[in-house]
From Swiss-Prot:
Disulfide bonds: none annotated. Keywords: Mitochondrion, Ribonucleoprotein, Ribosomal protein, RNA-binding, Transit peptide. Possibly has a role in RNA transcription or processing during stress. GO terms for molecular function: mRNA binding. GO terms for cellular component: endosome; Golgi apparatus; mitochondrion; nucleus; ribonucleoprotein complex; ribosome; trans-Golgi network. PROSITE patterns: RRM. Residues 36-114 form the RRM domain. The keyword Nucleotidyltransferase does not apply. Induction: Down-regulated by salt stress. It comes from Arabidopsis thaliana (Mouse-ear cress). This is Small ribosomal subunit protein mS86.
């Protein structure tokens, strides 16, 4: 029995670094997942994906564009994302479009992976309505609140 406790403690010692390594790898993966993806906030309720592509398409090739919709009402949540084929193009678009008018509204443009404040319940509490919901009006987009919250996408 004495040896069981020893092996148990030894097992915990060996498990800890692996857990830390996995955590670090996951963090690194999140931070570099899509560096050419930008967050566009302050969108008008009438702004759709086509208008978003039209406004941001002049900077370079758009790989993907999304306007996030409320799951229940189907209305725009006032933000979206544009993904370019390169980081340089994304940076140029962010600089050029920051605080510009689009569809009657002044928009804010930031790197999507910056974690710029706002909601998110983290890994344990995904889903928008229970925890902080994030969103542009609250200072940014929270990854956790977006992940499993069931918000619709328009592509």
């Amino acid at each position: 029995m004495h040896y069981m406790g020893l092996f148990s403690r030894a097992g915990n010692i060996f498990r800890q670094p692996r857990a830390l390594q996995a955590s670090n790898a996951m963090l690194q993966g999140n931070l570099s997942l899509t560096p050419s993806k930008i967050f566009v906030g302050g969108l008008s309720p009438s702004t759709d994906v086509e208008l978003l592509k039209e406004a941001f398409g002049s900077f370079g090739k758009i790989v993907d564009a999304v306007v996030v919709l409320d799951r229940e009402s189907g209305l725009s949540r006032g933000f979206g994302f544009v993904t370019y084929d390169s980081i340089e193009v994304a940076n140029n678009a962010m600089q050029a479009m920051q605080n510009k008018e689009l569809d009657g509204r002044i928009i804010g443009v930031h790197p999507a992976d910056s974690g710029g404040g706002g909601g998110g319940g983290g890994f344990a509490r995904r889903g928008g309505y229970g925890g902080g919901r994030g969103g542009y009006a609250r200072g940014g987009f929270g990854r956790g609140g977006f992940g499993g919250g069931g918000y619709g996408f328009v592509r």
